[in-house]
Amino acid sequence: MPSSCVASLPDWIDRMTDTRNGEDSGKLLYCSFCGKSQHEVRKLIAGPSVFICDECVDLCNDIIREEVQEAQAESSAHKLPSPKEISGILDQYVIGQERAKKVLAVAVYNHYKRLNQRDKKGDEVELGKSNILLIGPTGSGKTLLAETLARLLNVPFTIADATTLTEAGYVGEDVENIIQKLLQKCDYDVEKAQMGIVYIDEIDKISRKSDNPSITRDVSGEGVQQALLKLIEGTVASVPPQGGRKHPQQEFLQVDTRNILFICGGAFSGLEKVIQNRSTKGGIGFGAEVRSKEEGKKVGESLREVEPDDLVKFGLIPEFVGRLPVLATLDELDEAALMQILTEPKNALTKQYAKLFEMESVDLEFRSDALKAVARKALERKTGARGLRSILEGVLLDTMYEIPSKKDVSKVVIDESVIEGTSQPLMIYENSEPQAKAAPDA
């Protein structure tokens, strides 16, 4: 409690005594903590023979909030989940990708274990940081894995798009803007930001345009890789406060990126061909090993054999590949996996739409043939899990438009014909038999 509050208590006691003893109801009331009168504050809250003003309530809230946050930070540091626990929680949100989950769980566990041990004295071995590179097709779950990890560990998290980044001095975003976004996520708390996670998406789009040096600068390709090197490895980045523009007279926030975990992700379309060319390349002469081209091999299977040299041939510079020592590849999602994604995760799309309909007191049912049809459409569009929502939005648009105006609908049923667009959703009305709209004439 502030000294001013303590010093004012005797005065307040005298005032309260005067008020009680002197039968004058017109006397002022005073805050029991700071001694301010009811006219000096916005609100005076009365208790059994005591009063507290709104300013003291705010002060108490701030003190309690700080103590709770410190206690939570300490407990989270001591309660770092094991790799198996991390993988188990990822299973609740991400279907399949078991190998990628295992790699991520171990890498993240070791990273934060390293942070928890860094302040201990007597440790002669300094542990290095292991940033992560996720390689997988569009819609396979790269971003979702990173988001779920950050939510699980309760650390600041931001997503950056590599395609918008350019070298400093050119039109576009500087790499320091990534750290600025991370600071915004934690209300510019530098200490919190320095233990956060940054996910850089579309990292394959900043590959070198060609192996041959050119007269023109590659400001959005190799130039960005060079700019990201120090940031990812660990440097002190100067960031303008509160998102302002940089100018010479400005004071900058200094953010140390050594303990920020960087996860880079990309589809790397065409990388499988680089891998296959390497694995099928044979020698010359009688002692050469004879290898046949592996026809019909899935992209995910090829990507599992990726090596750093393949990434360099794809267009990443060797120094950049070296800063991302942990490689995790994700498989293409098949029809069965897409059907699981629609129904099994905690935040599955069918559960989300069912919740929206429940708010209108209507049950929503997806039949199994409808789920298969949605999965088939997503496979045809080659958008992976990302395309599932757009398909369902298109199917349910008219129904969601009509339902709020109809008070007698109790249930909506979606089957395969609705997904294929040959019929409308089946609406079941209260106290009536199900009525389906007639199918169109053949």
Swiss-Prot record:
This is ATP-dependent Clp protease ATP-binding subunit ClpX. Belongs to the ClpX chaperone family. Zn(2+) binds at C31, C34, C53, C56. HAMAP family: ClpX. Component of the ClpX-ClpP complex. Forms a hexameric ring that, in the presence of ATP, binds to fourteen ClpP subunits assembled into a disk-like structure with a central cavity, resembling the structure of eukaryotic proteasomes. GO terms for molecular function: ATP binding; ATP hydrolysis activity; ATP-dependent protein folding chaperone; protein dimerization activity; unfolded protein binding; zinc ion binding. ATP-dependent specificity component of the Clp protease. It directs the protease to specific substrates. Can perform chaperone functions in the absence of ClpP. SUPFAM superfamilies: Glucocorticoid receptor-like (DNA-binding domain), P-loop containing nucleoside triphosphate hydrolases. The gene is clpX. NCBIfam families: clpX (TIGR00382), PRK05342.1 (NF003745). Residues 19-72 form the ClpX-type ZB domain. Transmembrane segments: none annotated. One of its GO terms (cellular component) is HslUV protease complex. GO terms for biological process: cell division; proteolysis involved in protein catabolic process. The lineage of its organism: Bacteria, Pseudomonadati, Pseudomonadota, Gammaproteobacteria, Pseudomonadales. Pfam families: AAA_2 (PF07724), ClpB_D2-small (PF10431), zf-C4_ClpX (PF06689). ATP binds at P137, T138, G139, S140, G141, K142, T143, L144. Keywords: ATP-binding, Chaperone, Metal-binding, Nucleotide-binding, Zinc.
